[in-house]
From Swiss-Prot:
Assembly and oligomerization: Component of the gamma-tubulin ring complex (gTuRC) consisting of TUBGCP2, TUBGCP3, TUBGCP4, TUBGCP5 and TUBGCP6 and gamma-tubulin TUBG1 or TUBG2. TUBGCP2, TUBGCP3, TUBGCP4, TUBGCP5 and TUBGCP6 assemble in a 5:5:2:1:1 stoichiometry; each is associated with a gamma-tubulin, thereby arranging 14 gamma-tubulins in a helical manner. Gamma-tubulin at the first position is blocked by TUBGCP3 at the last position, allowing 13 protafilaments to grow into a microtubule.
Expression sites (tissue/organ): Widely expressed, with highest levels in heart and skeletal muscle and moderate levels in brain.
Family to which the UniProt record says this protein belongs: Belongs to the TUBGCP family.
Keyword terms, alphabetized: Cytoplasm, Cytoskeleton, Microtubule
Gene3D superfamilies according to UniProt: Gamma-tubulin complex, C-terminal domain
Annotated region (Disordered), positions in chain: 155-203, 521-545
Organism: Homo sapiens
Biased composition (Basic and acidic residues): 189-203
Keyword Cytoplasm among record annotations: yes
InterPro entries in the cross-refs: GCP, GCP_C, GCP_C_sf, GCP_N
Predominant subcellular localization, coarse grouping: cytoplasm
Keyword Cytoplasm appears in the UniProt entry: yes
Protein name according to UniProt: Gamma-tubulin complex component 5
Length: 1024
């Protein structure tokens, strides 16, 4: 069924035809009566009428255009960037055929369509095609001839010959001699510009030959570059003839003097070539570039200067031109980095053609490039003054005006030579980047020490450093904020070890490597960042100091901790809401570099706002100076010293000290004398107040978040408590059930080394009170040396308790930590074994074993037995009594040792450890606290090799206790008086030795924690 038209027939016929043509072109349907054609037509009209797309956003389009422009600049496509910028601006500022306004929605809609159709504009090659604008056709109709058609005029005999033909031919003949003689205005002299503007000027009369010649003489530069010898023009001014007078003097003083052929130039020409040289132009006449060195042509002379004087001035300028060429060469190489280019100072060894300069060199190049832009603008202003001829400009005036710039060029060349050119070609990028940043940093500090005389130089170096340090700060920001250490060129001093994944237990120790260079050997070394971060301020021997990026030294530990913490946080499974909130915060976040610049600017503004305060401070300082001067004079007069200058200096010194204390007493450093001197006088304070606080804040945030996550989501504190409960036996009831079952087996002389039996006993004991830890605990037994097995105290050697710690808690509770825990666990087990063996002995057992022989003899031999046992009854009782006393002494010793370790060492140290864990700011600090805690209990339990003799004495006493318990259990009949006496003697010697050693240690004050043990053992010795 055919339709006659759309329901909204108010639309004009032109749109109707366009839509139908669109359907034919896209769908390929030609018959309008076709139902498919009508469906497509209705669909098209519906989308036009009720479209779903938004109106164009002009701000978004301009932001996209600016982003593409910056991308072209970053990719060093400067020609594409310039074309893109110019063409888009021309289009936006040009009216459309049906719209007279500019920058309308139609303009931005067309640009939006083109941007949507574009595909990676930075990767496509583009050469701008010249666009010839249509020029309005001039009216060639000869109105004069038409109007004067019937008039009779005497035109002269040469009416057919144009009166300008001969001059035009002469002008055309001279044009090939023109040259590219300006670095600021390359292809056109001022004459040509003015001549183009005056082509249709009716005031120029070509018939009047003298006027034409004078005009040409005033506006066309004499071709001094043809190197033709010129005659000295004579002037009535004596100073203008100095060169001729000097030549005449030389000729009169030396009859054989023959003047060389020289080219006479004007001072203006010398000035302009000087400006062109400093702007980077290489093809000059007065200055020649030969084998990369700028030299001055020897035959140049001006009328008012001698040849030697002019040459000395120009040679100084040539030296600065050489600096400009060297720096410009570096800029071109970094921008282009073609296969033939080499970095300065690389000699004959070229760099790899595929390796682009790393970002620090690119940032340094960009800083130099921006400096030269402002420098060339200043040179262009001077040349405009010369062209306009408004003021008198001489070579001396130009050199004096450029003196600050020339001194800056000297400083830039020194920094460039030290930081870039003198670096060997095979040096790693990390060393190149750190060396360049250190060179700038040291140069700022060096010129900063000079004071106000070098404020401009320090300001220049500071701006250069701020631009050069941008990639480093961006790398730091990306790492400590997002957890990604992106460093493709490997120029950052910290490198990621990709072989260790994040979820590995060695991630915290072996993931990152800190590169440093020894100043003396210049050899690259690798240090683990764990060592550097854990050592804190300890830098090792003073003879071997390592250099790195100097400005990052105060916050290097915070950067490493924040970066590793953030990467660990990113890999932990956090809640989605937290991730969304972090993403929203990151969208509003400013980068570290931006925050640093804003802080510096606010510091500068604060210095500008404090100008009225400075005046009052100066007045107060003057008054204080007068007071202090009078006081100093009175003190000096007492010593018969009359020196007013010395008094003034003393007074000024006291004032500076008081001013220093006033500034730094409150902790808020504010040294803002002027806006210029803020960065000059206090560069390190500027870093301390503008950069370091932002790094510290991010360090506290991400490390605090990591600690909170580990404590709450991953139960770090609970796992630490579990290690103390089982390894240090703070879970007393649980571990008592476990080790008493083993001790009973040993007392009954039964086999107890079976691993299955040990694990069953451990699971039964732990499962009752700590069911969540029973699956993580296990115990194993390894056979020890047979020599140790002979001693009862070493029968427990080989027992090893294991606790499965999940990731990431195993970063804190590592396998090395569990080894230390096991050493303390074994010592506690040995002490408890001795204590248990003595505790279970009963007095009745020993008495009953003494009476058994009498009961066994029977009544038959009663008289003989009584006769024999009667005289021996008293020695047996004495033997029993001595064994009772020895048991009490051993129990006192073992109980004193047990109480000392369980209360004074483990419990007190554990309370300190819990408090330190709560206050730990980062994971590295927590690891150190845990290691320090283990080291403390390891030392205080006398397990260190240095005090092994004390431990041997204690082990000997424990061994005596176990042997005594075995003998007690065997019965009195197995004892002899000699063995009891020997055991008493051994115990007394060990007891005396330990008391003496411990008392000396306590008196020295080196081991205050041993005081309680020493007093307890002394009490036992007094009882004996």
């Amino acid at each position: 069924m055919a339709r006659h038209g759309p329901p909204w027939s108010r639309l004009d016929a032109q749109q109707e035809r366009d839509v139908r043509e669109l359907v034919r072109g896209v769908a390929g349907l030609q018959d309008e009566a076709d139902p498919n054609f009508q469906l497509a037509l209705n669909f098209a009209w519906s989308n036009f009428r009720f479209h779903r797309f938004l109106d164009v956003n002009s701000h978004k389009i301009e932001k996209t255009i600016e982003g593409i422009y910056e991308k072209f600049v970053i990719h060093s496509d400067l020609s594409k960037a310039a074309s893109w910028k110019r063409l888009t601006e021309e289009f936006l500022n040009a009216p459309l055929p049906s719209i007279k306004e500019i920058k309308t929605d139609a303009h931005y809609s067309i640009l939006s369509l083109l941007l949507c159709l574009s595909d990676s504009p930075s990767n496509s090659s583009y050469v701008e095609t010249p666009r010839n604008k249509e020029v309005e056709k001039k009216d060639d109709f000869d109105w004069g001839k038409y109007l004067m058609e019937d008039e009779e005029m005497d035109i002269g005999p040469y009416m057919d010959t144009p009166n300008w033909s001969e001059e035009s031919e002469e002008e055309n003949d001279q044009q090939p001699l023109s040259r590219e003689d300006s670095g600021i205005q390359v292809d056109r002299t001022p004459l040509e510009e003015q001549d183009q503007n005056r082509k249709l000027d009716p005031c120029i009369s070509w018939k009047d030959e003298p006027d034409d010649r004078s005009w040409l003489e005033h506006h066309v530069v004499h071709q001094y570059w043809t190197a033709r010898p010129s005659q000295f023009p004579h002037s009535l001014h004596l100073h203008s003839n100095l060169a001729a007078v000097w030549d005449q003097h030389l000729y009169s003083s030396d009859p054989l003097y023959v003047p060389d052929d020289r080219v006479l130039v004007t001072e203006t020409q010398v000035i302009r070539e000087t400006l062109w040289l400093l702007s980077g132009v290489k093809k000059l006449f007065i200055f020649q570039l030969i084998d990369g060195k700028v030299t001055v042509r020897n035959n140049i002379i001006v009328t008012h200067l001698t040849h030697s004087c002019l040459r000395s001035v120009l040679e100084q300028i040539a030296a600065y031109g050489q600096v400009v060429f060297r720096l410009q060469e570096f800029i071109d190489e970094v921008m282009g980095h073609s296969s033939e280019s080499m970095l300065p100072g690389s000699g004959s060894v070229p760099k790899k053609s595929t390796e682009a300069p790393f970002r620090t060199y690119q940032a340094f190049m960009w800083a130099l490039y921006k400096y030269f832009i402002s420098f060339k603008e200043e040179l262009a202003e001077i040349e405009k003054c010369i062209i306009n001829n408004d003021t008198t400009i001489t070579l001396a005036i130009v050199v004096d005006k450029l003196a600050p710039r020339l001194s800056q060029l000297k400083v830039l060349h020194k920094v460039f030579s030290t930081g870039v050119a003198e670096v060997p070609p095979d040096t790693r990028n990390v060393v190149r980047a750190s060396h360049l940043l250190n060179t700038l940093y040291k140069a700022i500090l060096e010129y900063d020490n000079v004071g106000e005389a070098s404020e401009q130089t320090v300001s220049l170096l500071f701006s250069l450093w701020v631009e050069t340090v941008r990639p480093y700060l961006q790398t730091v920001d990306e790492w400590i904020v997002h957890g990604h250490l992106w460093d493709g060129a490997r120029e950052f001093i910290i490198q990621r070890n990709k072989n260790v994944p994040v979820n590995h237990r060695d991630f915290w120790y072996a993931t990152y490597t800190l590169y440093s260079v020894s100043e003396k050997t210049e050899n690259e070394e690798k240090m683990s960042d764990n060592a550097s971060a854990s050592s804190g301020s300890d830098q090792g021997p003073s003879s071997r100091q390592h250099t790195m990026v100097s400005f990052l030294k105060p916050v290097l530990k915070q950067i490493i901790m924040a970066g590793k913490s953030m990467q660990l946080l990113k890999n932990l499974q956090c809640a989605e809401s937290t991730t969304c909130q972090a993403g929203a915060r990151d969208a509003e976040r400013k980068s570290l570099y931006t925050l640093f610049l804003e802080s510096v600017q606010s510091r500068l503004r604060h210095g500008e706002d404090s100008t009225p305060q400075v005046l009052t401070e100066q007045q107060a300082t003057k008054e204080n100076l007068m007071k202090m001067q009078s006081i100093a004079e009175s003190h000096l007069e007492l010593d018969d010293v009359h020196d007013p200058l010395l008094a003034i200096n003393f007074a000024r010194m006291y004032l500076e000290q008081s001013d220093f204390h006033e500034k730094f007493a409150g902790g808020d450093v504010c040294v803002d004398r002027s806006s210029e001197s803020v960065t000059c006088q206090t560069f390190e304070l500027t870093l301390r107040s503008c950069l370091y606080p932002h790094i510290d804040k991010q360090y506290l945030d991400c490390c605090g978040n990591l600690m909170q996550t580990l404590k709450k989501d991953y139960r770090l504190v609970e796992y630490l408590q579990a290690m103390r409960n089982f390894f240090l036996m703070e879970g007393g009831d649980t571990m008592y059930d476990f080790y008493t079952s083993i001790f009973d087996k040993i007392r009954e002389k039964e086999t107890w080394q079976n691993v299955s039996f040990l694990n069953v006993q451990l699971q039964e004991a732990v499962g009752q009170r700590y069911p969540e830890d029973s699956s993580r605990l296990s115990i194993s037994f390894e056979n020890v040396d047979t020599a140790k097995k002979k001693l009862p105290v070493h029968i427990l050697d080989g027992l090893t308790l294991s606790y499965k710690v999940p990731w990431p808690v195993d970063i804190v509770i590592s396998l090395e930590c569990q080894k230390i825990y096991n050493q303390v666990f074994l010592l506690l087990l040995q002490i408890k074994w001795a204590k248990y063996s003595l505790d279970v002995l009963l007095f009745g057992e020993l008495v009953s074993t003494a009476e058994k022989p009498r009961l066994k003899e029977g009544l038959i031999h009663e008289q003989d037995t009584v006769a024999q046992f009667g005289p021996q009854k008293e020695p047996v009782r004495q033997q029993i009594h001595r064994m009772f006393l020895l048991r009490v002494k051993l129990m006192h010793f073992v109980n004193s040792l047990h109480n000392y370790i369980m209360t004074r060492i483990l419990h007190s140290t554990g309370l300190e450890f819990q408090h330190q864990v709560e206050e730990a700011k980062d994971l590295d600090q927590l690891i150190k606290i845990h290691y320090r805690y283990l080291s403390t209990i390891h030392d205080r339990c006398l397990l260190r090799e240095k005090v092994s003799f004390v431990k041997e004495a204690i082990m000997k006493v424990l061994n005596l206790a176990l042997m005594f318990a075995d003998g007690w259990q065997a019965g009195l009949g197995t004892w002899r008086m000699e063995s009891i006496e020997k055991m008493e003697s051994d115990f007394k010697n060990c007891h005396m030795f330990l008391v003496t050693i411990l008392n000396k240690a306590v008196c020295r004050g080196s081991f205050p924690h041993l005081e309680s043990l020493a007093l307890s053992l002394m009490a036992g010795m007094e009882q004996s």
